[in-house]
Structures are given as C-alpha cells and as structure tokens.
Regions:
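Metal-ion/cofactor- or nucleotide/acyl-coenzyme-handling active-site neighborhoods
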Residues: 1-201
Length: 201
C-alpha cells in the first residue's frame, strides 16, 4: 500500500503542488486545474459532473473512481455507461458515519477517504483545500459546472464541510495529514497527527 498519497483539490492553493515533483500516489478531484503526471485516478462524486461529461462538456483525465451518485447516473443512462465504462477504475460507495448524507461529502472528502480507507496510506497530502483555511469556496470545477456560491450556500457548505475534516482527522489518528496552504491560520482545531506546510510561490 502507498506510504504517501497526494490529493489535489481545486482551490486556488492547489497551484503549490506544481512547484516540484512529488513522490507518492496522486488522486485528482473532478477536472484538475493542471496536468498531473503519474496520476492514479480522478475522483468523481457529483451527478452534475456526470451530466456534463455525458454532454461532452468535460473530460476528466485518466481513470475514474466514482461515488454513489455517478453510479446512479450510469444506471439510469446505460448508453453513457457503456461508452465511459473503460474509464471507470471502480465505483467506491463507502461513506463514513460522520458524513450525514452524500451531498455533504464533497469530492475532496471522497478522495481523502478513499486514500485512507481503501488505499491505507500512511501520509496524506492535501493540496488546494482552501475552504478549510479561508472563507473561499472558489473551485476550478466551477469553470465546468455552474455551482451556487451565494453567501447562504457558502455558509452552509463550510458549516458542513469543515466538521467532516475534523472527524476524518480523528478517525484516522495513525495517519499523518499534511495540509499545504499559503498560511497556517486554519479555521478548525486540528489534532497532533495534522500539520500545516506553509507554501510560498
């Protein structure tokens, strides 16, 4: 099993990943903001993303690890499923109990949980997860999918998303989490197995 896994999210600070070559297995989320060499898979959790792929408006790179909503989309669109079946590495349907429902479990959560639970990584690097640190939900994926980023939705999303990270850090207490960001003023309490690497351009 891999010692280190890098999950490349779609927030502004994902760019720091590109500064130098990185050792370890790489997972992307939806459509990554740049090309990732030696990528293990792209993770997809959204019904909307599958619809955009089906319409020919997006083409996530590499093989795909898909969640329950993409699985449902494939079941209800069998021709589409046949067309993209060679791209699907697997359907991964696990969800931790601290994610109340699948809509609270975003693509970053999904990719991280897959790396932890399925791949059994010992160290997990998180790049471009700006919403843990700042009130910033800008995402490269928004260029592909029209997302509601209004103030009420921003508040709801950060209220739902951040507690899941806290629970995940506790759940996998023997894993070292490395959060890469432009500052260390994180908005949640973090346990001893989580450290912040402050990156500069």
């Amino acid at each position: 099993m891999p010692k280190a896994v890098h999950v490349i999210g779609n927030g502004d600070c994902a760019q720091f990943y590109t500064k130098e070559p990185r050792k370890g297995l790489k997972l992307a989320c939806n459509v990554p903001p740049f090309e990732i060499s030696d990528m293990y898979a792209t993770c997809i959790v959204d019904f909307k993303m599958m619809s955009v792929i089906d319409a020919g408006q997006a083409n996530p790179p590499g093989e795909w690890v898909c969640g329950i909503r993409p699985k449902h989309y494939c079941e209800t669109h069998p021709r589409f499923h046949m067309r993209i079946a060679p791209r699907i590495k697997e359907f991964y349907l696990e969800k931790p109990k601290y994610a109340k429902n699948y809509t609270d479990f975003n693509c970053g959560h999904f990719a991280a949980y897959y790396a932890l639970q399925k791949l059994k990584c010992e160290r997990l690097h998180l790049w471009g997860f700006d919403s843990i640190f700042d009130f910033n939900l800008r995402s490269y994926t928004d260029l592909v999918i029209n997302s509601d980023r209004g103030n009420m939705n921003n508040n709801r999303l950060t209220t739902n998303w951040r507690p899941i990270w806290q629970e995940m850090f506790k759940d996998f207490k023997d894993v070292e989490f490395v959060l890469h960001h432009k500052h260390d003023a994180i908005k949640i309490k973090i346990p001893d197995n989580v450290r912040i690497e402050v990156e500069t351009k």
